[in-house]
Amino acid sequence: MKQHPTLFLVHFVATAAMTGLIWFVQVVHYPMFSDIPAEAFLTYEIEHQLRTSSVVIPFMMTEFLTGCYLALRSRPLLSGRDLMLFRGSMFLLAIVWGSTFLIQVPLHEELSQNADPYLIDSLVCTNWIRTICWSMRSLILGALMVQWLIIKE
């Protein structure tokens, strides 16, 4: 990591930001969807998608692009066990993206047409995939960062 510590730090910060955001969404935001009156829900859902996208897209793209660069061009930035851990964290990121575009986005599209309580429950339940994966990524990347800052310096 000595050659590109700033890039790794940017990657870690983007991941940590998404981890904090996803926990807020999981514990506060999505569960409150069921409290929105049915007559206001469709408008709310569309506005939610627009506003949320403007916050998460920059972080998700930063995380994805810096992660891909580090995973593909990591030697000698990362090697051995550290490289394996980092690539494992990228596998978790692939799960996050898969869950986002194969599960959460379609659920939001359905919710923008129909304020079905079952769809809201599905959104909350399936969002645990992303919450757990981003949390694990933060732990892995945080451990790598601490190791780099404390042990290797």
Model-derived features: where do they sit?
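Interfacial segments of alpha-helical transmembrane regions
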Residues: 2-16, 77-94
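Short, charged juxtamembrane terminal tails flanking transmembrane helices
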Residues: 1, 149-153
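Interfacial loop at the N-terminal end of multi-pass membrane proteins
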Residues: 2-62, 109-125
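Mid-bilayer segments of alpha-helical transmembrane spans in multi-pass integral membrane proteins
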Residues: 94-102
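Structural signal for the C-terminal ends of transmembrane alpha-helices
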Residues: 69-76, 145-150
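Alpha-helical transmembrane segments of multi-pass integral membrane proteins
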Residues: 112-146
